């Protein structure tokens, strides 16, 4: 075999001490196929940009990377309900590179399987280019791209110096992405948050792309928008980036996806290639169902989703899907458990890692309870999904029976409203008002939005999209 040679594209940039970060000498996106290896008998190149996107089917509906939540079983379920691309949970690059036990816990034989789990993007957090490359090499052949997490806003990311806490260190971000771009056999992508200043965000996005990122996902929240200050993602800044980046940029939008028709609206208003959902997907896997399909498929029965998901988990090898199961069950059943608090207590007692019989008991309880509901003579009048008037933000709120999966609207201004919501769910006959529908503030203009407290089920290790 002839001697292998590597050919790298050198991208020049000037590091500035200004807060806006590096100033690119070539601000337009530089997209050139890098030859990975070349010998007298063969050559190999990796797809980039639009060609890569088209090779995986031009996906439009994407499961976001979520810590301990976008694991294999959940990805399989989400694909059945319309997801066309999935990201893994965020993996810690140094641990993935150096700890066999960590890899075994996080990555199993079915992960990235061509028949079960593709297309797939594997996400890592990192602050060391060498560890990132070592980690990424473990998943070559089992994914379509590797993503760098530049969005995690949580305290653990601050302490570990990764995620959104690299946003001011453009030199390091460039080196992390470019290391994979020039030395890894699969493409690299990136997911970012925004700065308050849209021009600074645009320069940031250009730098990420020039480093070699083939897809750019923009989460329209700043690093500070978390916990009590979560608020809404700003679609206007996402659209500004889309309009001002090269048109051939493969561009995904993330944030504010509550219903299937929000995906259609986002694609149209922003002009993005695809829409990513995190929390919306966790509470209702049907969020990825086409908005033109039957409403009852867009908002599936909780007992049906629970049984389907549980059967998938039982089949999946490894521990990752089992560890995540309890959290998923709480989210899928959230509106149901507000009414049937006895079953909530049973869910809380489950040991999902070692005791499948605990889960089976809960699944059967939920199935029996929902069957009782559907045995009522007036079920056709009760099992109705209705939409309110069109709002200024372009969509409308939906009134969904509590036995169907639906988005979770966090209480606002410190008022939980749990009792009011529960009574509304029980009656299914009350009109939509600000008293029983606290989500009415969710789509206010950016400067009018109230602060929103954390999800009650969020643990110290955040389960949100990062």
Q: Where are these predicted regions, by residue range?
A:
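Active-site beta-loop-alpha junctions enriched in small/polar residues
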Residues: 66-68, 91-93, 125-127, 151-153, ...
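Conserved beta-strand positions in the central sheet of alpha/beta enzyme cores
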Residues: 87, 121-123, 147-149, 217, ...
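Alpha/beta enzyme core
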Residues: 137-146, 150-160, 171-249
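Glycine-rich, positively charged N-terminal anion/phosphate-binding segment
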Residues: 45-57, 66-139
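Short glycine-enriched, charge-decorated loop/helix-capping segments at active-site entrances
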Residues: 161-167, 227, 292-296
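Polybasic, lysine-rich low-complexity intrinsically disordered segments
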Residues: 4-5, 23
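Intrinsic-disorder-associated, low-complexity terminal segments enriched in Asp/Asn/His/Tyr and depleted
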Residues: 8, 13-14, 18
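Alpha/beta catalytic cores of nucleotide-metabolism and tRNA/nucleoside-modifying enzymes
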Residues: 2, 11, 26-31, 36-62, ...
């Amino acid at each position: 075999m002839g001697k292998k040679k590597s050919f790298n594209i050198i991208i020049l940039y000037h590091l500035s001490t200004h807060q806006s970060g590096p100033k690119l000498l070539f601000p337009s996106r530089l997209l050139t196929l890098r030859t990975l290896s070349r010998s007298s008998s063969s050559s190999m190149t990796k797809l980039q940009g639009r060609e890569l996107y088209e090779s995986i089917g031009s996906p439009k509906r994407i499961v976001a990377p979520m810590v301990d939540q976008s694991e294999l079983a959940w990805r399989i379920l989400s694909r059945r309900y319309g997801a066309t691309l999935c990201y893994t949970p965020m993996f810690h690059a140094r641990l993935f590179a150096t700890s066999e036990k960590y890899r075994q816990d996080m990555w199993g034989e079915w992960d990235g399987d061509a028949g079960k789990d593709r297309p797939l993007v594997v996400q890592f957090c990192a602050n060391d280019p060498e560890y990132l490359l070592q980690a990424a090499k473990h998943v070559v052949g089992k994914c379509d791209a590797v993503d760098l997490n530049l969005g995690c806003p949580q305290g653990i990311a601050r302490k570990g110096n990764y995620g959104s806490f690299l946003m001011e260190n453009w030199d390091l971000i460039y080196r992390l992405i470019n290391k994979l771009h020039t030395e890894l056999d699969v493409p690299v992508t990136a997911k970012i948050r925004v700065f308050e200043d849209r021009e600074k965000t645009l320069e940031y996005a250009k730098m990420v792309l020039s480093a070699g990122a083939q897809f750019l996902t923009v989460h329209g929240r700043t690093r500070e928008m978390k916990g009590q200050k979560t608020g809404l993602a700003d679609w206007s800044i996402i659209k500004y980036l889309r309009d001002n980046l090269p048109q051939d940029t493969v561009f995904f939008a993330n944030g504010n996806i509550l219903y299937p028709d929000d995906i259609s609206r986002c694609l149209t208003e922003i002009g993005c290639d695809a829409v990513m959902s995190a929390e919306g997907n966790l509470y209702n896997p049907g969020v990825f169902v086409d908005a033109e399909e039957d409403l009852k498929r867009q908002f599936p029965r909780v007992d049906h989703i629970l049984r389907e998901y549980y059967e998938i988990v039982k089949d999946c090898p490894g521990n990752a899907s089992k560890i995540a199961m309890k959290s998923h069950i709480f989210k899928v059943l959230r509106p149901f458990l507000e009414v049937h608090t006895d079953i909530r207590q049973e869910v809380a007692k489950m040991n999902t890692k070692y005791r499948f019989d605990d889960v089976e008991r809960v699944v059967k309880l939920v199935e029996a309870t929902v069957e009782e509901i559907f045995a009522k003579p007036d079920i056709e009048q009760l099992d109705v999904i209705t939409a309110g008037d069109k709002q200024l933000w372009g969509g409308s709120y939906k009134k969904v029976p509590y036995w169907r999966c639906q988005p979770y609207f966090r209480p606002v201004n410190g008022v939980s409203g749990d009792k009011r919501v529960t009574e509304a769910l029980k009656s299914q006959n009350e009109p939509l008002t600000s008293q029983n529908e606290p989500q009415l503030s969710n789509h206010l203009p950016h400067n009018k939005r109230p602060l929103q407290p954390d999800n009650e089920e969020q643990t110290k290790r955040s389960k949100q999209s990062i």
